[in-house]
Regions:
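Hydrophobic alpha-helical transmembrane segments
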Residues: 1-80, 84, 245-290
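Secretory targeting signals
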Residues: 23, 34-75, 79, 105-171, ...
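Juxtacatalytic substrate-recognition/specificity segment
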Residues: 45-46, 50-56, 90, 362, ...
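Acidic/His/Gly-enriched intrinsically disordered linker/tail segments
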Residues: 141, 646, 650, 660-737, ...
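N-terminal, polar/Ser/Thr-rich
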Residues: 199-207, 219, 224, 252-320, ...
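A surface-exposed beta-strand-loop module
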Residues: 334-335, 344-413, 462-466, 554
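Extended, low-hydrophobicity, Ser/Thr/Pro/Gly-biased non-transmembrane segments
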Residues: 385-517
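Amphipathic alpha-helical substructures
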Residues: 712, 717-796
Length: 875
């Protein structure tokens, strides 16, 4: 095979292609279209995600080029076969002695070289935009090469190969072009999420964004996917060469070798694709086994871990932990086989109690200890384990498709100076895929991955919204990481062996993060507020010019705003924001506030706030339409919109720190009872305003479904806002018997009397009855079972004066078979302010209600969760 002939044919083919109008149309689209789109979307974009990371510019360039390149290759691949058949544009070569292999290789190399040159031109323009107009975005030239070789080049080879093969088989030009375009459109829109992107040559479902902390997520799986399409593309190109009928070279030895190579490459591609798909299927099978094992031991009485001292070491992606635990049987009966949970990828080296080896069985993440524990008995354990974290254990309640979904959840599009954050969905970037990471460069371990022994699984598979914790006295010693920043809960101390963390009180969860972090800390009143970020990611303080004292005053003021919004001071003396790699995805469990990004004393933010909105001081000055406002005003807006407002967003909501991270109230009889009780405590702090469609949806959901049934419905999980409305309704019914304000004080006192404990609801119910002489247990029994909503008729709303006192009044009739409730704000003479009044409207009854009201003419009646629309009536 003569290389000079191949180069000559390739040169001639490029000249022919450049003469076509379609080529220049594609060239304009590639050069000006992609550049224009990137300029519009990324230069001075209000969407922070477009310019936050070093990978977004090269990735967007590769993404759009892949799309246009595929269209170009389809047209060119079909056309050059058609030209040879009909137009005779290559008669110069067709009449010569070049073999079919030389001739086709020349034409193919000509097309591919032209596409590669166009790709380099597109990359060059993107680099110019990156360097000249996006100076704040880190420039990493190797990322452009990475996307060239892993994203655009394999797609070029595959699409060109399948286009040639189709053109050789289908002799009609228009039919071949039509079928290829239908296949392109169909695969483009239908295949990204089918079988985890196995049939998507553009790899849009794979997490291809680069993290400065850990690089690419699942790089091995990514390379398998790209090799599969590259090998299949090479094989199809070789097969297309064999189908050329220009010369009879069937006896050529190289032709036979080419046939073997074609078959071999296609088989290699299929094998790589099968390995890629099998990776996901194997994870799914393991998750099924983990679910079966957990449900098998779900109903067993459990022990509690009251203390856990750990010595942590790691080497590469393997960790080694020596754990000293104290188990206590606080149940009302003996436990034959105490159950603990540990990541299934971690093997137990030894398990002893007071130097006596204990026998145990393991089923996935379930550790069954063969040692009977009597009621009230304590059992000290020493457990040594090591291995590699298996991330398949995380979020067992999720269906496989959702677990493997790598798309970047909900992205706030922009944030105005007041902190309002309209939201949209970003479909271009896929960043997820990781739930834990252990490595020499970076380590992050959250409780979800069971990196330490626990008596409670991460999720209750029967009722995913049900939260249960053991408040444990954790002591953590990390050895061999003196050169890194080690982050965990508690007070840090350095010693000869390494870094240790201890806590002043028991914690419900423990996290560990090790990496190259920079840190800024400020002490405000008694709170130590810290920010940990990766080197070069100090965009938090960009443009801030306040002195430390002024910053402390500003922070104190906004923490006071936070306290007023929650009605309570922050119940921790340390709060840190920790930057984590962009490859990690937060999940909001059914009916819960705060994701796995919210841990005791720690709130994890994604790398450079990539998935969120961010406003720099410069951006806020533009929005305020001024060159420079008062420093405190502008920087206060930045602090509120970029940090503090996020503490009330679902993913980063810190309400668990005020609620179950302080005291967990649990009950097997009343699932999620702790959430309902804390709903009472914080009911006066915020209101959720639903649209008409949301109200209709809420009514349709609850009319015919009980709270207990909704919590246990795994096929149709209840949304958080719907669950919140149901809890508010039940709390309103309870408030008809006990003043809401008195219940607020009672719950706060109860939490203070049982700090950092797991408390049985029976204790709460007993103290509640002692305080108010109300059997809340019997009330909840009925309210948990109610599966209908009342219908209320309200009439004769009016304001009148009685002895100079303004009164609001109305008449209410409840014709339904279930009790209803009305809320009317009235004036409290003792408190000298408005307060809510709750009135029970029993089934099949009517009432006339009068309340003292000094907010003339704003007399309003709220009907709670019922079949009425509107659910609030004004006078």
């Amino acid at each position: 095979m003569a290389l000079d002939k191949i180069r000559l044919i390739a040169s001639y083919e490029r000249k022919i292609i450049r003469r076509h109008l379609s080529f220049w149309i594609f060239l304009i689209c590639i050069v000006f279209g992609i550049a224009g789109v990137q300029w519009y979307l990324q230069v001075d974009s209000p969407v922070w995600a477009e310019s936050a990371l070093s990978a977004t510019v090269p990735y967007m360039n590769a993404w759009f080029f892949n799309l246009l390149q595929s269209l170009l290759v389809i047209f060119v691949g079909v056309e050059f076969v058609w030209r040879d058949r009909r137009l005779g544009t290559n008669e110069t070569f067709l009449s010569r002695s070049e073999t079919n292999v030389e001739y086709m290789f020349g034409k193919i190399w000509g097309v591919m070289k032209l596409c590669l040159l166009l790709n380099l031109v597109s990359i060059g323009i993107a680099i110019m935009i990156h360097l000249l107009f996006m100076e704040t975005v880190a420039f990493k030239p190797l990322l452009y090469l990475f996307y060239l070789f892993t994203l655009t080049f394999p797609a070029l080879v595959f699409v060109f190969g399948i286009s040639l093969f189709a053109a050789m088989l289908i002799r009609n030009y228009y039919l071949a072009l039509l079928l290829l375009m239908i296949g392109f459109i169909g695969s483009y829109f239908a295949t990204p999420w089918v079988l985890y992107g196995t049939f998507d040559p553009w790899a849009r479902s794979l997490p291809l964004l680069f993290s400065d902390a850990i690089g690419f997520a699942n790089i091995g799986i990514l390379l398998l996917h790209r090799l599969a399409y590259f090998f299949c593309g090479i094989g199809l190109i070789f097969l297309s060469v064999l189908l050329v009928k220009r010369m009879d070279d069937r006896r050529s030895a190289f032709r036979k070798v080419l046939g073997i190579l074609a078959s071999g490459f296609i088989l290699l591609g299929i094998f790589a694709g099968a390995l890629y798909l099998n990776t996901y299927l194997d994870i799914n099978q393991r998750r099924v086994r983990f679910r079966i094992a957990q449900e098998k031991y779900m109903k067993s009485d459990r022990v509690q871990v009251v203390s856990n001292r750990m010595v942590y070491k790691q080497s590469g992606d393997r960790l080694h932990v020596e754990s000293f635990l104290l188990l206590v049987n606080k149940s009302k009966q003996s436990i034959d086989t105490p159950i603990l949970y540990l990541n299934p990828g971690l093997s137990i080296v030894s398990l002893t109690s007071e130097e006596q080896e204990l026998f145990y069985n393991r089923e996935g993440h379930v550790v069954v200890i063969k040692r009977r524990m009597e009621c009230g008995e304590e059992l000290p354990l020493r457990v040594e384990y090591e291995g590699i974290i298996d991330e398949a254990i995380c979020y067992l309640e999720l269906p496989d498709e959702e677990y493997h979904d790598t798309r970047m959840g909900i992205l706030p599009l922009s944030a105005d100076p007041l902190g309002n954050m309209p939201k949209t969905r970003h479909e271009l970037y896929s960043n997820g895929g990781r739930f834990a990471h252990v490595g020499n460069k970076y380590t992050i371990l959250l409780p979800e991955c069971l990196w330490y022994l626990s008596a409670v699984p991460p999720v209750n598979l029967q009722i995913p919204s049900m939260k249960d914790f053991d408040f444990t006295d954790y002591r953590l010693e990390v050895e061999g990481q003196e050169s890194k920043t080690v982050i965990s809960q508690g007070s840090m101390k350095k010693n000869e062996k390494g870094i240790s963390y201890s806590n002043d009180h028991p914690l419900p969860r423990l996290s560990l993060c090790i990496g190259d972090y920079e840190q800024k800390t400020i002490t405000v009143d008694s709170l130590s507020f810290g920010v940990y970020y990766f080197p070069g990611h100090d965009f938090w303080t960009e443009g801030y010019n306040l002195s430390p004292d002024s910053s402390r005053l500003l922070m104190s003021y906004h923490l006071g705003v936070l306290e007023r919004q929650t009605g309570n001071s922050l119940p921790v003396n340390r709060l840190s924001i920790v930057e984590m790699p962009l490859n990690f995805r937060p999940y909001l469990r059914q009916g819960q506030l705060g994701s796995n990004f919210v841990q005791p004393e720690l709130v994890f933010f994604p790398e450079k706030l990539f998935t969120e909105s961010y406003r720099s001081i410069k951006d806020i000055l533009k929005l305020l339409k001024t060159k420079r406002s008062l420093d405190s005003e502008v920087e206060g807006v930045a602090l509120r919109s970029n940090v503090l407002n996020r503490f009330f967003e679902p993913i980063y909501n810190i309400m668990p720190m005020y609620q179950e991270f302080r005291t967990t109230i649990y009950s097997d009889k009343f699932p999620c009872i702790g959430d309902l009780i804390y709903e009472i405590r914080f009911s006066g702090q915020s209101k959720d305003h639903l649209s008409l469609n949301e109200k209709v949806k809420t009514i349709q959901y609850w009319d015919g479904r009980s709270l207990r049934g909704a919590l246990m419905d795994r096929d149709n999980p209840v949304e958080y806002i719907m669950l919140k409305k149901k809890r508010e309704h039940i709390n309103s019914l309870i408030a008809t018997r006990v003043e809401m304000m008195y219940m607020w004080d009672f719950i706060e006192d109860f939490v203070k009397c049982h700090p950092f404990q797991r408390v049985d609801f029976d204790v709460f119910a007993r103290e509640f009855k002692d305080q108010f002489n109300v059997n809340i247990d019997s009330l909840l029994e009925r309210y948990y079972a109610d599966d209908r909503l009342p219908t209320l008729f309200v009439q004769d709303l009016k304001m009148e004066s009685y002895n100079g006192i303004p009164l609001g009044s109305c008449k209410v009739y409840n014709p339904s078979n279930i009790d209803g409730v009305l809320r009317v704000d009235g004036y409290d003479q003792k408190l000298r302010r408005q307060r809510p009044n709750y009135f029970l409207i029993p089934a099949k009854s009517c009432k006339e209600i009068r309340v003292r009201n000094y907010t003339i003419p704003n007399f309003a009646v709220e009907l709670g969760l019922c079949c009425n629309l509107p659910d609030k009536i004004w006078y």
